């Protein structure tokens, strides 16, 4: 990356929406979901050890499904690729699989494929991924707001660990609000905003557990 690319990247970061700038990059920054990412939990240990198997995250919007995928992207030694099931076609999937096979064969490097809104893939698209999950060509991470037991291929389900994310608690939302208004690097800390307890309570109440 040359100086121009670096400056362009920094400019994009600074102009990104607040929610994007404040998205956690490490497990320690993630708020809530202690039932799956507490220090004694399987997912926490797997991410820390970089020993992941295929995973499906499901839960309401704003609970951290994509955030956890991004944390994995920031910590894993595997190649991290992603597709959105609402827009990805067969060609996109074939390109990912081709690259994954090359990396595994030439360098022994694994590939993690994150599929957002995986329930949007039709049966044929889900079936296409199955053999490559089975033979280890890819490690699949799917994210969905729907119950995967009804919306995702049963064979993919049987080869994945399912983690349910829950709506954030009011205290979690308040903690995120406080972080956003005090963080001087990524948040609004340089504006010296004072968010009193009543305002935090109100915002936490109307959020509905959606960060």
Regions found by a protein language model. Name each.
Residues 189-206:
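Short conserved motifs of the RecA-like P-loop NTPase core
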Residues 84-86, 161-174:
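Conserved AAA+ ATPase "SRH/arginine-finger" region at the nucleotide-binding site
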Residues 1-49:
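A short, basic N-terminal segment
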Residues 207-211:
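The conserved phosphate-sensing helix
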Residues 36-41, 78-112, 123:
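Short glycine-rich substrate-engagement loop in P-loop NTPases that contacts/grips substrate
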Residues 44-48, 115, 119-158:
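Conserved catalytic/switch belt of AAA+ P-loop NTPases
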Residues 1-11, 45-83, 98-101, 130-135:
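Walker A/P-loop
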Residues 159, 175-189, 206:
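Conserved AAA+ ATPase "sensor/coupling" helix adjacent to the nucleotide-binding pocket
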